[in-house]
Amino acid sequence: RVIITDSALNQNAVDIYSNEYVFLDSEDDRIFDKTIIPLNDRATRTLAVSDKDYFIFTGWWTAYCIQEEYLNWGGKALSPNVFIYLIQDYEPGFYQWSSLYMLADSTYRTKYKQIAIFNSVELKSYFDFLGYEFSFSYVFEPILNAGLKKYLKTMNKHIKKRKQILVY
């Protein structure tokens, strides 16, 4: 299942993916091989989960929603499978010691087993420096795909570059 948490579905997405995926409401517990569930309006909605679900987080708020629910259940219903967290930035740093800072930070410190996948060695090193611990962690170095790289090389002739430092 793909659960969309940040935006509503648009017709273009439905047109593109409807041959391969079944689009379901979050409260629909029917099982299909591939489903997409829009949950951007999740404040008053529920999501059926099972012991076969694995959650992959791509932002702290996606992690927080699921981790908090498992904590609220207190182990009465289901214990989660290991969480998988794609970490692309140090997200608490966007929130300047606020309550959002603490919420973002808490998702890295969950008591549940969690696999961290970092998008750079530098980011992984920073998390190690801050003392975050994960069940397992992996690092990949993102690369520019061949099509964009080819296009970028042609643009160098047309774009004037200058080095700039921003201090705030």
For each feature predicted by the language model, list its residue ranges.
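N-terminal pre-catalytic "stem/leader" segment of glycosyltransferase-like enzymes
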Residues: 1-51
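Nucleotide-sugar donor phosphate/pyrophosphate-binding loop at the beta->alpha transition
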Residues: 39-40, 91-108, 146
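Membrane-proximal helix-turn-helix segments that form the acceptor-binding/catalytic region
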Residues: 44-51, 77, 98-117
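A short, active-site helix/loop in glycosyltransferases that binds the activated sugar's phosphate group
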Residues: 65-66, 94-96, 100, 112-137
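Conserved donor-binding/catalytic core segment of Leloir-type glycosyltransferases
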Residues: 117, 157-168
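Active-site proximal beta-strand in glycosyltransferases
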Residues: 54-56, 73-93
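Short beta-strand->alpha-helix junction loop in the catalytic core
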Residues: 89-91, 122, 139-150
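Short N-terminal targeting/anchoring amphipathic segment
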Residues: 45-65
